[in-house]
Swiss-Prot record:
Cell compartment(s), UniProt: Plastid, Chloroplast
Superkingdom to which the source organism belongs: Eukaryota
UniProt keyword list: Chloroplast, Plastid, Ribonucleoprotein, Ribosomal protein
Residues spanning the signal sequence: none
Gene: rpl2-B
Protein name: Large ribosomal subunit protein uL2cy
InterPro entries: NA-bd_OB-fold, Rib_uL2_dom2, Ribosomal_uL2, Ribosomal_uL2_bac/org-type, Ribosomal_uL2_C, Ribosomal_uL2_CS, Ribosomal_uL2_dom3, Ribosomal_uL2_RNA-bd_dom
Keyword Plastid among UniProt keywords: yes
Annotated organism of origin: Populus alba
GO CC field: chloroplast; mitochondrial large ribosomal subunit
Pfam families listed in its UniProt record: Ribosomal_L2, Ribosomal_L2_C
Region annotated Disordered, chain positions: 1-20, 224-274
Length: 274
C-alpha cells in the first residue's frame, strides 16, 4: 500500500495521507446499479444508526465470496478500489471465460494465478476446505455455513489462524481474538486480506469523511439534558453520573451487548478480547 503525503499548502492538506496506488474501473458487467445505503434509517425513516448520511454515489461490485469455480485456474487481471469496503478487490479471468471479483489477498500481484477446490496447493489466494489445510495456516474469507460463502475475516488486513482440527470441527483464532469452532468442510481462502495499512490513512479534513457517508459526531456532554443523559450544567460540567450512559440511558461502557443463549454460544471457546 502506497501512502501519499500532501504538501502543507493549505489547511485541508496539512494532515492528509491517502492511498494513491489503486484506481477504480466502472466498465465491467460485474459493476451495476446504484448502491443506495439506508443512511442509518429503518423502513419507517427513523434513525437507528447515528452519524450516517450523505456521501458520494456508489456503484455496487458483485464479489464472489463462495469461490465455486472449482478446479479452474484464474488469473488476476486488475487490482481495484471498491467504495463499499476497506479491502481492495481483484478481477479474475478464469480459463472457461468466467470473470469474477474476489477480495485482494495481501501480496498478490497482477498476473498471479489462483484456483479453488479440494486438495489444491496451499498458496496465497487459493480457496479450499479447512480439512485440507495444515495447522497454523493464515486464512481469510471463512465460511460459517457450508456453501453460503465467506462471512468471517473479510475486512482490510484481516487474517485468522487454523489452530486445531478434531472430529468434524476445526478451531480458528479470529482477528478479534475469539476462538471458535467451525465445520471442517467449510472453505476459506489462504492468506491475509490486502490493504493492511488502511489504518495509516489520514483523511485530513472533514469534507473527506463526508464523502464516505460519515456525519459529525457530537459529544453528549455538550448537548442539552433533553438530548442526552450527559447534557446540561453550567459551563464544562461533568456528566453527573457514576457511569457513562448512551443517549437512551443504558450503560455505555463495559456492558455486554451480545444476545443471551444464542445458538452459537457452544461453538465459542473463548470470547473476543476488547
Amino acid at each position: 500500500m502506497a501512502i501519499h503525503l500532501y504538501k502543507t499548502s493549505t489547511p485541508s492538506t496539512r494532515n492528509g495521507a491517502v492511498d494513491s496506488q489503486v484506481k477504480s474501473n466502472t466498465r465491467n458487467n460485474l459493476i451495476y446499479g446504484q448502491h443506495r445505503c439506508s443512511k442509518g434509517r429503518n423502513a419507517r425513516g427513523i434513525i437507528t444508526a447515528r452519524h450516517r448520511g450523505g456521501g458520494h454515489k456508489r456503484l455496487y461490485r458483485k464479489i464472489d465470496f463462495r469461490r465455486n469455480e472449482k478446479y479452474i485456474y484464474g488469473r488476476i487481471v486488475t487490482i481495484e478500489y471498491d467504495p463499499n469496503r476497506n479491502a481492495y478487490i481483484c478481477l479474475i479471468h478464469y480459463g472457461d471465460g468466467e470473470k469474477r471479483y474476489i477480495l485482494h489477498p495481501r501480496g498478490a500481484i497482477i498476473g498471479d494465478t489462483i484456483i479453488s477446490g479440494t486438495e489444491v496447493p496451499i498458496k496465497m489466494g487459493n480457496a479450499l476446505p479447512l480439512t485440507d489445510m495444515p495447522l497454523g495456516t493464515a486464512i481469510h474469507n471463512i465460511e460459517i455455513t457450508l456453501g453460503r460463502g465467506g462471512q468471517l475475516a473479510r475486512a482490510a488486513g484481516a487474517v485468522a489462524k487454523l489452530i486445531a482440527k478434531e472430529g468434524k470441527s476445526a478451531t480458528l483464532k479470529l482477528p478479534s481474538g475469539e476462538v471458535r469452532l467451525i465445520s471442517k468442510n467449510c472453505s476459506a481462502t489462504v492468506g491475509q486480506v490486502g490493504n493492511a495499512g488502511v489504518n495509516q490513512k489520514s483523511l485530513g479534513r472533514a469534507g473527506s469523511k463526508c464523502w464516505l457517508g460519515k456525519r459529525p459526531v457530537v459529544r453528549g456532554v455538550v448537548m442539552n439534558p433533553v438530548d442526552h443523559p450527559h447534557g446540561g450544567g453550567e459551563g464544562r460540567a461533568p456528566i453527573g453520573r457514576k457511569k457513562p450512559a448512551t443517549p437512551w440511558g443504558y450503560p455505555a461502557l463495559g456492558r455486554r451487548s451480545r444476545k443471551r443463549n444464542k445458538y452459537s454460544d457452544n461453538l465459542i471457546l473463548r470470547r473476543r478480547s476488547k
